[in-house]
A protein has these predicted regions:
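Extended, well-ordered alpha-helical scaffold/bundle regions in very large, multi-domain proteins
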Residues: 2-64, 185-213
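Acidic, glycine-rich two-metal-ion catalytic cores of nucleic acid-processing enzymes
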Residues: 23-169, 232-285, 299-308
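C-terminal, non-catalytic extensions of nucleic-acid polymerases
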Residues: 95-96, 299-334
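Short, solvent-exposed polar/charged micro-motifs at secondary-structure junctions
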Residues: 136-138, 289-291, 329-334
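Hydrophobic alpha-helical membrane-insertion segments
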Residues: 139-141, 194, 293
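Short alpha-helix boundary/capping elements
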Residues: 146, 183-187, 290
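Conserved catalytic core of nucleic-acid polymerases
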Residues: 162-281, 320-334
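Catalytic palm subdomain of template-directed nucleic-acid polymerases
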Residues: 190-191, 287-303
Length: 334
């Protein structure tokens, strides 16, 4: 599946992916990709205030994960002359139009390590905001699965799914860990083998998920068939060529990932326009630098922007947003 590049604010089919007699016309006309690329470049130049990883943590990590400790040491070397680590990201780097962070970055590490290195200036702290259950709910919105949308508005989706008779014995984390592979198209036998559970048990879970997400399955399958028929798939800001050799599961999941990227771009533009100090984006999360004296107002303002961004893409439906971490520079405190 080939990405169709974006230039400024018009996304075209690219002639080098096309037959000589194919009529090429613009698929998408809007300024969002251009505005996002500009905002993203501005965010990257600001960077994130960090301190080096301490030696005891490096030694402990070295015993567990040598690849991770190499990343940590690379970051330490970059912080020798400057306590501000700039991010290097590439907009529209994937076929779904998502941005990819390249090279040493805070995004290279799991969140449990962030408190070891984040070091905001006095009077400031970093706040991580995150869209809740983004991919399942995007799928539900694409499929007009109103029952799932209603559950999401009122309660935690994964907790609510435990009410199903065949999922009642599972905790929230287990259900979350099953749902995403299911939505991505993983088969029950593959899941059973990967997690070392009986095939009959995995099949029972998959049947339960199919009962809950049958409208989603139908819609994603329909979009996938249409993409193979038309030879391309598109969202608000991006498009990709689909060929008979394209991976079916990737094509099926493309609208969900691409819609998430559409939302992120509008959220970034909205945060920058609102004067919120956004320092880093990671998939569907946003790291903000906020004055402690204005913490509540800034967070509330940012959450409003993120909800509005999702509504612009999901026909008025707002994704829930949570505070997923607060980092004030104290080591080990999230």
């Amino acid at each position: 599946m080939n990405a169709i590049p974006t230039y400024k604010y018009i996304t075209h089919l690219n002639p080098r992916y096309s037959s000589s007699d194919e009529h090429l016309t613009p698929l998408i006309r809007n300024q969002t990709p251009y505005l996002y690329a500009k905002a993203n470049s501005f965010i990257d130049t600001k960077g994130v205030e960090m301190r080096p990883f301490n030696l005891s943590l490096l030694a402990k990590t070295c015993q567990q994960d040598t690849n991770l400790v190499v990343q940590m040491m690379r970051v330490n070397n970059m912080l020798l002359s400057n306590n501000n680590l700039r991010n290097c990201s590439v907009p529209f780097h994937t076929t779904t139009g998502r941005t990819t962070n390249i090279g040493p970055s805070l995004s290279s590490f799991k969140k449990n390590l962030w408190s070891e290195v984040l070091n905001p200036a006095p009077g400031y702290q970093y706040v991580l905001l995150d869209y809740m259950n983004q991919e399942p709910i995007i799928s539900a919105c694409l499929a007009s699965a109103h029952e799932i949308q209603a559950i999401y508005r009122q309660a935690d989706l994964y907790e609510s799914m435990r009410k199903h008779r065949d999922l009642a014995g599972l905790n929230r984390g287990r259900i979350k860990g099953m749902l995403l592979p299911y939505l991505y198209g993983q088969r029950s036998d593959s899941y059973a083998k990967e997690h070392g559970i009986p095939l009959a048990e995995a099949q029972r879970y998959w049947l339960a998920l199919a009962e809950i997400f049958h409208l989603v399955d139908q819609e994603l399958n329909r979009r996938s068939q249409l993409a193979f028929k038309n030879g391309f798939v598109s969202c608000l800001d991006w498009a990709a060529r689909v060929t008979p050799l394209s991976a079916p599961l990737s094509v099926r999941n493309w609208p969900v990932q691409a819609t998430g990227a559409d939302i992120l771009r509008r959220a970034v533009i909205g945060l920058v326009d609102a004067g919120i100090d956004l320092r880093l984006t990671i998939h569907d999360s946003f790291l903000l630098r906020v004055p402690i004296a204005e913490q509540e107002q800034q967070i509330a303002k940012a959450i409003t922007v993120l909800k509005q961004a999702s509504a612009l893409v999901l026909d008025g439906f707002e994704l829930n947003v949570k505070v997923d971490g607060v980092f004030d520079g104290q080591v080990g405190v999230v």
